[in-house]
Amino acid sequence: MGGQIRIPDGIVFLNGIPVVVLEFKSAVKENTTIMDAYTQLTVRYRRDIPELFKYNAFLVISDGANNKYGSFFAPYDFFYAWRKIEADDKELDGISSLVTMVSGLFRKERLLAVLKDFIYFPDSSDRDTKIVCRYPQYFAATKLFENIKKHLKPEGDGKGGTYFGATGCGKSYTMLFLTRMLMKSPYFHSPTILLITDRTDLDDQLSKQFIASKKYIGDETVVSIDSREALRQELQGRTSGGVYLTTIQKFTEDLELLTDRTNVICISDEAHRSQINLDQKVKVTEDGVERKYGFAKYLHDSLPNATYVGFTGTPVDGTIEVFGPVVDSYTMTESVKDGITVNLVYDGRAAKVTLDQAKVKEIEDYYAQCAVEGANEHQIEESQKAVAHIDAIIGDPDRLRAVAEDFIRHYETRVSEGATVAGKAMFVCSNRKIAYDFYQIVVGLRPEWAEKKICPDGVELSDKEKKELKPIEKIKLI
């Protein structure tokens, strides 16, 4: 176009179709970088030879020492290295990462697998959205797929395996890739897949993503379940297919058998919390002994022949017992090195605790009474150790206010210095009540943080941005 010749450095053809375009720069030239290669592909070539990219799968930019790939529509920050040849290999950098990319990503059968199952387009989008898997997502999905086949009931034990992925590493896309592989595989005979979370906000996030991916998944029945009865109606009588998203709390003791089919796969997000409580709990009440099980017990009773897969950023013993051993992992160290998540740096900011003297006397009187009633010194000592961490101390109003004031000062200083990632911060409390009390104190000190806005004050937006952006508050309690 325009009478000018453009010659890309490399093109990978598949049956005559240009599926990958590569651009190379020299590592020894100080005035050129792979950022220049990115600009050349996504700006100049996009403008001058757009027909070349009609069937493009992804781009590669390289100077020999720095080697990255990514979607034609992706910003430069979303181009990543492929740092392994095989899943259990050690990650490699520098010139070695060129070998891992060529041997790991461009091996014939693997490139075909990536083209087939690991490039995602949403069903509809008002912008150019295309997601190409990263190497940890590819290895996690493929290893879980094979492990599910191995442990599928009735021949297997129904423990499809555990995936340990660092927080923020893209587990939801790994679930999406795995779901497509399961639905497209003749081996599973069009399985029914349940995606289960333990919080409504996680359920909403996954539901939005999966419902917008029906064509990619290969099943028009992708449904967010909002009640036990709706789940029963959807699953009973169904012989195959369907993707259902729900929360573990939908599974209570009044939920009867849903199906005894073996081609049912349950994928659990945050599989270290309420999704592993299979044991019976006994509680003595005024009316007698009360026996209860956790939500996970009722889930497994409702779907006795299902195969269970767990995704977690915090694997515990209970996770392994319910879902099986860790099949693949992607650690925080690896994620930071790949530029997926930011590094965590400890900055000690201990808050002094001063208790109301009335509370101190109340506690002392309690232990004196325990001794009178026959508690031995060991029992009293153990209880005193425990009370040092009770919520009455941690959630003391004076302490919470001091912590909130320090947090606000620290946060605002870091933002002004440009030391945060887009002004983001996360505050973790020991329980919901303390979190709520802390939230109320912060909002009282900074009421404007609770106001819903589409952007910070003073930031100018285009008309398009004003239409697309939705107002949100600066601080949110979850």
Named regions from a protein language model:
Residues 226-244, 257-261, 470:
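Conserved motor-coupling elements within RecA-like helicase/translocase cores
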Residues 1-197, 201-217, 239, 243, ...:
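ATP-dependent helicase/translocase motor core
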Residues 22-23, 59-63, 137, 168, ...:
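Conserved structural-core and active-site-/substrate-pathway-adjacent residues in large, well-folded domains
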Residues 19, 26-29, 65-68, 200-202, ...:
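Conserved nucleotide-binding/hydrolysis micro-motifs of P-loop NTPases
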